[in-house]
Amino acid sequence: MQTPKYRRVVLKLSGEALAGAKGFGLDPQVLTALARQIKAVHDMGVQVAIVVGAGNFWRGRLGEQMGMDRASADYMGLLATVMNALALQDAIEKLQVDTRVMTAVEMRQVAEPFIRRRAIRHLEKGRVVIFAAGTGNPYFTTDTAAALRAAEIEAEAILMGKQGVQGVYDSDPRINRHAVKYDEVTYQEVLAKNLQVMDATATALCMDNRIPIVVFDMMGPDHIVKVVLGEDVGQTFVRGNNQ
C-alpha cells in the first residue's frame, strides 16, 4: 500500500460538482464516485473531514440579485449545505464507512451539533466527519468554514476540490485560454493578486494558521486519492514562504 502524504485533512468539495451534467440538484453517480474515493483515502488510515458547498442548490449572491436580504439568502445556502452533507453521508455509509454530519447550527433531529473535541474524537475513531451549515453565520462562505474547521481540528492541509479547473491561474482559464497556471503560490500572492482560490477571509485564516491549501480538479479520475498520495494531477500548492 502506498503511504499517504497527510494524516488528517479537510476536503473541500464543490457543491456545483455534485449536480453532475444536470447543473442542478444531486447526481447519484457523482456522489457514488466521490464516496468511493473518500473510502479509499479513509482505508489508507487518513482522517478525513469534509466541507461541501451549496452551489448545486443555491448561492447567497443569487438571492441578493433577486432583492432578498443578504443574511436570509446566506441562511438558505447554509441549509443547502446540510442537504448535500446528508446525501454524501448516505453515499459513504453505503460503502460501510461510519460517517457523522456535524452542523454549525443546531438541528439535532438531523445531525450532531459541531463540538470541536467530539469532531476530533470521531476522526480518531476512524469516522469520516462532514461539517455542514458553514460557520453558522451569514456573510461567511463555505471556504471560510473549511479554513475555520481545518484550524480547529489541526488538519495538515485543506484539499480544495474545484470543478473542471486543475489548479490556480492568473485569470479564469474557462474564459481566457491564455491564462497562466501556478504550480505553487503564496498566501500573500493570492491576496495581493486576488487569485480565485478562496475568499480573502479564508485565505487569511489559512495564512495565520499556516494551513497549506492544495487546489485540484476534483472531477478527474481518482484525483482525490492521488492528491492524498502526493501524486501530480496538475494541482497548485498554496502556502507560506517557509512551508
From Swiss-Prot:
Keyword NAD in annotation: no
Compartment(s) where it occurs, according to its Swiss-Prot or TrEMBL record: Cytoplasm
InterPro entries: AceGlu_kinase-like_sf (IPR036393), Asp/Glu/Uridylate_kinase (IPR001048), Uridylate_kinase (IPR011817), Uridylate_kinase_bac (IPR015963)
Known EC number: 2.7.4.22
Binding site for UMP: 74, 135-142
Pathway in which the depicted protein is active: Pyrimidine metabolism; CTP biosynthesis via de novo pathway; UDP from UMP (UMPK route): step 1/1
Catalytic reactions of this protein: UMP + ATP = UDP + ADP
Keyword annotations of the record: Allosteric enzyme, ATP-binding, Cytoplasm, Kinase, Nucleotide-binding, Pyrimidine biosynthesis, Transferase
Domain of life of the source: Bacteria
Region (Involved in allosteric activation by GTP): 20-25
Any one Gene Ontology molecular-function term assigned to this protein's record: ATP binding
Residues noted as binding ATP in the record, renumbered to the chain: 12-15, 55, 59, 163, 169, 172
Assembly and oligomerization: Homohexamer.
Name of this protein: Uridylate kinase
UniProt gene name: pyrH
